[in-house]
Amino acid sequence: MVNYLKELNYKPDSLISTIMLAGMEIDTNNFNTKTTAETYEAAAFLARNKANQILKRKILKESREAYLKRNELIKKSFMITKDVAICVLDNKVYYRNELAEISEDLLTLDKIEAAFTIGRTETNEISISARSLGSYDVKKIMQALNGGGHKNEAAAQITGNTLEEVKQKLIELIKR
């Protein structure tokens, strides 16, 4: 989008620059994934066009309740190898992005190279969100469960199994 603006010689105002920069941070998980030199150049362009850092932080704020809820769920995680964590949620129904956020947060912890979050996302559907810092190809693991994605970010949706059954299948695949 920034390249398009540059081609048109369009100078976005502060609000547009701020919103675009906030979107970039969301899309790249705070410049931690899917980030290239062009990503940083686009961010610099938006900063030069007066992206408001304070407003951006306000736009990206999450509620205290959501933060505390996610951290309570993260407490359920455990290590299955020296560098792989799994978090199995309770039987409540969660949004898929909640599972992804937990896996992303687990990757910020020391010694965790891959993280998997298992949770119910529909009445009869269990989802797995898989994230890796590169040491594990989570796409291959998720493909074995009829899922897909990328080497460092993948997911699967499974029907007809319990959380415990999905957890056991996942552990078997990881330990292969």
Enumerate the predicted regions with their spans:
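A short, charged helix-loop
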Residues: 1-23
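Hydrophobic helix-and-loop "lid/oligomerization" segment in the mid-to-C-terminal part
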Residues: 21, 26-176
